Amino acid sequence: MKKLQIIFLNYSIKLKLSMNSVIKTTILGCGSSGGVPRIDGDWGVCDPNNVKNIRSRCSILVEKITNDKKTVVLIDTSPDMRQQLWKAGVTNIDAVLYTHDHADQSGGIDDLRVFALRKRERVNVYLDKDTASRLIPRFNYCFKSGEKHGYPSILSENIIDPYKELIISGPGGEISFIPFLQHHGSIFSLGFKYNNIAYSSDVVDFPNKSLNYISNLDYWIVDALRVTPHPTHAHLDKTLQWIKDFNCKNALLTNMHIDLDYEQLCNELPNNIKPSYDGFSFSIDI
């Protein structure tokens, strides 16, 4: 009997170990709306010899990996999405989440077509009502089949509400996201919290209701556009104060303009704060 109990105990331990999952976050792009360098070759103060200063437009990939199976979630479809996903080796997307509809977050949307063709089904896109009201008319052909363009739609829209849990399912298991509102000039953008990590790419301030979602984080990927203040984005000093005030353990700066050099930031920032760079990733066990 004892031998049988030991066998079952060992089996249970092995089963638990085999079901361990990780959440992997990849910074696909961390540049401002014009990227670094700008299209005219302007690097600003960024050293062109440092590859970590080459910044495509903002986007991240969130993956839950369980026993070599993945649930893959893309946040925003930047104009650089094709190259970003190719470099990251992405062959499947289970869902796309949108922070807002600005061109640097949505310009690559048409390249989602390949994932719809591979799966022979529409890709699920999640966005709030305000973003949908602007994004869907602009890219109507992606969401609605029609005689005018002659192509089937490739995307299915799903309207989400701020502060309500969103669960994305896929081969690697479920990922829980909480969208929260952020002030972004004259509009709201969405931040997303998952597994005590938050993504805040385009933000100048937060409504009071959102503060709980950015407090005591393990990781915060957060907007730090430039050195001087800006009407729609947080500048460096403001972001650093947020990180301190909200007791964030680790922070990664994103949406960085040409006046923020990677090496200079590394030398000046506290140890728990780093500038992002395209392709950087980190994982946590869950």
Each language-model region and where it sits:
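Active-site-proximal loop/helix segments of hydrolase catalytic cores
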Residues: 184-190, 194-223
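Catalytic metal-binding/acid-base residues of hydrolase active sites
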Residues: 80, 102, 204, 225, ...
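Binuclear metal-ion centers of metallo-dependent hydrolases, dominated by the metallo-beta-lactamase
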Residues: 163, 207-286
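Short hydrophobic targeting helices and cationic amphipathic motifs
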Residues: 9-11
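Binuclear metal-dependent hydrolase catalytic cores
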Residues: 4, 15-200, 266-286
